[in-house]
Amino acid sequence: MKDQIKDFIHYVMVERGLSQNTIVSYERDLKSYSLYLTETLHVTDWNHVTRIHIIQYLKHLKDSGKSGKTSARHLASIRSFHQFLLREKVTDKDPSVHIETQKTERALPKVLALNEVERLLDTPKLTSPFGYRDKAMLELLYATGIRVSEMIELKTADVHLSMGFIRCFGKGRKERIVPIGEAAASAIEEYMTKARGKLLKNNVSDALFLNHHGKQISRQGFWKNLKKIALEAGIKKELTPHTLRHSFATHLLENGADLRAVQEMLGHADISTTQIYTHVTKTRLKDVYKQFHPRA
């Protein structure tokens, strides 16, 4: 059964051009699914998997304390995999059809207030190459709203400071052009002229943002730095790698930006994904009203 999972992972990597994070999620979910089938249900052939087996696996996830969102992701991975097996004629049926996970209320993204963003962006000290790099990364994330995975994949050739935009590749390697403001452009220019060469050392790399080995910085490396910077900035809120992306979208909408324009900048295929930020702005307005209105 492991061979078919390997074939599927190769397919999504080569033919569908999915991001590394998505591929890792697929592989992790399917290994967990396969292990449960073989060790708990004693199913050793994909042709013998039934709808009941999948439902039992989803119940196992729930009983293990997994969230509805996690179960939904596992089911999406399982569906894609069984569709692949059917298409490749490994199996003659898709047992995942018509299986639904329990609908869960979508949590509102956590965002920073403007003064918190400013504290965060002002924290990196421009006394070392790492300070210039961290400043440039944070300014870029807040200025563009791009995903952390998109930022770390940026090449030097993707940055067009004189024209005020960057080129990035989103989910499914979909290309998009995103404008950047003066503050971010200035921070990137300073990083490239004063710091990147020192981080590069004797290595050869076209990656824009480098680690201390002169190689492309990893998502985990950025996340570790972000937590450290947030602590220094005195930010008490729980942060995620997407916090600046969420703040970017929310602050744009609060200041009257068009929803479709924000959708395009974020690279959302479906505008309903972008609409979650309109709920965030309404919630924030209610909080302000309750806090400051004398008769709230």
UniProtKB/Swiss-Prot annotation:
Keywords for the protein's UniProt record, in alphabetical order: Cell cycle, Cell division, Chromosome partition, Cytoplasm, DNA integration, DNA recombination, DNA-binding
Entry superkingdom: Bacteria
Gene Ontology cellular-component annotations: cytoplasm; Holliday junction resolvase complex
Active site: 147, 171, 242, 245, 268, 277
Biological role stated in the UniProt entry: Site-specific tyrosine recombinase, which acts by catalyzing the cutting and rejoining of the recombining DNA molecules. The XerC-XerD complex is essential to convert dimers of the bacterial chromosome into monomers to permit their segregation at cell division. It also contributes to the segregational stability of plasmids.
Family note: Belongs to the 'phage' integrase family. XerD subfamily.
Protein name: Tyrosine recombinase XerD
Source organism per UniProt: Bacillus subtilis (strain 168)
